């Protein structure tokens, strides 16, 4: 089972924590991780694109000229696709790009990316993380204490308003509750900082 140092908020050592082998110690499956990232990114697409076809473009109800005798090609409407200002053929319509992968695949992906962070020594476990009031300066000091100077995802147990507000103005720092942890969020950040209570919640769901 993976063992990591447990850090206090001031960066000092608070002992060790043993992580669950089935969540943080599996052989990472990169293919599954990529599949889930693509699925989650697809779900974020708006899909509100829309063009008008010939029946939706305003006007064009009258036949431009008579069928025969003019020497010109026959035309039924000035809103036909071949006309300037006409409707679009097979253009984009509103749709959802979302698709779901099996639950087993999604679980394997989150376990794989968590195990990757452990293998790459990019997982930091905190004894706890609390702030009496929203203070960006204090949060920046906390990051300095634990030697984090890159994009970091901070996972806490439940909602923590002061922590979220303190980190809001810091570029590259995202705070989420343990229930919202996702493959895409973990992949977007270089380091994963997680509290001991959040580790227990994640293990409870995934183990």
From Swiss-Prot:
Domain of life of the source: Bacteria
Keyword rRNA-binding: yes
InterPro entries for this protein: Ribosomal_uL4, Ribosomal_uL4-like, Ribosomal_uL4_dom_sf
Keyword Ribonucleoprotein set for record: yes
GO terms of biological process kind: translation
Gene label: rplD
GO molecular function terms noted in the UniProt entry: rRNA binding; structural constituent of ribosome
Protein name, UniProt field: Large ribosomal subunit protein uL4
Subunit structure: Part of the 50S ribosomal subunit.
Alphabetized Gene3D superfamilies for the sequence: 3.40.1370.10
Residue stretches of biased makeup (Basic residues): 60-71
Function: One of the primary rRNA binding proteins, this protein initially binds near the 5'-end of the 23S rRNA. It is important during the early stages of 50S assembly. It makes multiple contacts with different domains of the 23S rRNA in the assembled 50S subunit and ribosome.
GO terms under cellular component: ribonucleoprotein complex; ribosome
Alphabetized UniProt keyword annotations: Ribonucleoprotein, Ribosomal protein, RNA-binding, rRNA-binding
Similarity comment: family membership: Belongs to the universal ribosomal protein uL4 family.
Region entry Disordered, spans: 47-78
């Amino acid at each position: 089972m993976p063992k990591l140092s447990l850090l206090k908020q001031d960066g000092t050592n608070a002992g060790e924590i043993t992580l669950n082998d089935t969540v943080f110690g599996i052989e990472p499956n990169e293919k599954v991780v990529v599949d889930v990232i693509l699925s989650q990114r697809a779900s974020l697409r708006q899909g509100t694109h829309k063009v008008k076809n010939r029946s939706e473009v305003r006007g064009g109800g009258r036949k431009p000229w008579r069928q025969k005798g003019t020497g010109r090609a026959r035309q039924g409407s000035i809103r036909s696709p071949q006309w300037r200002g006409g409707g679009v053929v097979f253009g984009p319509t509103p749709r959802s790009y979302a698709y779901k992968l099996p639950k087993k695949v999604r679980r394997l992906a989150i376990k794989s990316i968590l195990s990757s962070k452990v293998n790459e020594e990019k997982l930091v476990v905190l004894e706890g993380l609390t702030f009496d009031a929203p203070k960006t300066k204090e949060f920046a000091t906390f990051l300095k204490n634990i030697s984090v100077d890159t994009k970091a995802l901070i996972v806490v147990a439940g909602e923590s308003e002061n922590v979220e507000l303190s980190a809001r103005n810091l570029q590259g720092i995202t705070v989420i509750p343990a229930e919202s942890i996702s493959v895409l969020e973990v992949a977007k950040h270089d380091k994963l900082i997680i509290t001991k209570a959040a580790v227990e919640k994640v293990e409870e769901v995934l183990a």
